[in-house]
A protein has these predicted regions:
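Short amphipathic beta-strand segments in non-cytosolic proteins
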Residues: 66-75, 202-220
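Beta-strand-rich domain onsets/edges
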Residues: 25-43, 123-188, 192-198, 212-213, ...
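Short, aromatic- and glycine-rich surface loops/edge beta-strands on solvent-exposed regions
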Residues: 98-110, 238-245
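Sec/Tat signal peptide C-region and signal peptidase I cleavage site
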Residues: 18-24
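Glycine-centered loop-to-beta-strand initiation motif
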Residues: 84-88, 217-237
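Short, ordered, surface-exposed loop/turn motifs in non-cytosolic proteins
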Residues: 59-61, 196-209
Length: 271
């Protein structure tokens, strides 16, 4: 099955956020350190969906879809995984020098249709959608959701092997390395949609610890024709970036709605 975007139009933080709301539920992963040096290093990563950044107070993140890409592009295992009421946690052994991509998310389908006077709803993957005959139901409405939540950690000298993209949904292609961000200096990231530059995508950036501020003091930006956004973090700290888009696609020749969300957590260091 092949799903292709016919049109991508920006919307704020679909599925993972409710932009502009003080009680927004935001998904995030936060490592114990973003940059390290030396041998035998580990990081512990927290994952949650919360009202405040990075204060777990709503629900723990599901760790079933966590993947880690090492500095050589190979998969790295998440260790000591555990989930509590409000927060999930796992460890990553940094055995090789370079940059690690830590990611969670999914690619799934939902469907709804009328049957025998009742409204039916279904959720699953592309294979089950076909195998169960869901897409053949009369009047069925199908939507696809591609979501990613990521962070990056670097041991020693940074590299870019872990930045390789998959070509599906919204993805980050760093111009500024996410572990080389400093307060007061300009940062540039590129967003891709299905492997191509994602123009006109709305992005929200918020510094953590908003629980202790009277306002979020967030930035709202829109990617340019090359999918690039440029900003300057004014203060040091951990930041949360969220982007979302919605458009029409096709599945086996039928039009469907396609939504994609992307979240990344990064750190701005003091100069």
């Amino acid at each position: 099955m092949k799903t292709t975007f016919l049109k991508a139009c920006a919307v704020a933080a679909l599925a993972l956020t409710i932009a502009g709301s003080a009680s927004a539920h935001r998904a995030w992963m936060l490592p114990s350190s973003f940059t390290l040096s030396g041998e035998g290093q580990w990081v512990t990563v927290d994952g949650a969906i919360s009202n405040n950044l990075f204060y777990p107070n709503h629900v723990a993140m599901n760790l079933d879809s966590v993947t880690i890409t090492g500095p050589d592009g190979a998969a790295v295992e998440a260790q000591n995984k555990a989930s509590g009421k409000y927060r999930s946690v796992f460890d990553v052994a940094l055995e090789k020098e370079g940059t690690y991509r830590i990611s969670s998310g999914g690619d799934g389908y939902t469907a709804s249709w009328e049957e025998a006077g009742e409204r039916k709803r279904w959720r699953g993957n592309a294979e089950a959608l076909k195998a169960e005959g869901i897409e053949a139901k009369p009047g069925v409405e199908v939507s696809r959701s591609v979501r990613r939540i990521e962070t990056f950690v670097t041991l020693g000298a940074p590299n870019e092997a872990a930045f390789a993209t998959k070509g599906t949904g919204l993805e980050l292609k760093p111009i500024t390395h996410p572990n080389d961000v400093y307060a007061g200096e300009e940062v540039s990231f590129q967003l891709l949609m299905d492997g191509a530059a994602a123009e006109g995508v709305e992005v929200e950036i918020i510094r953590g610890s908003d629980r202790y501020r009277n306002s979020e003091d967030g930035l709202k930006l829109t990617t340019n024709a090359e999918g690039i956004l440029t900003f300057t973090p004014e203060e040091a700290g951990a930041y949360w970036l969220s982007a979302g888009s919605e458009g029409k696609g096709t599945l086996n020749g039928k039009e469907i709605t396609v939504r994609s969300t992307y979240v990344v957590t990064f750190e701005a260091l003091p100069l």
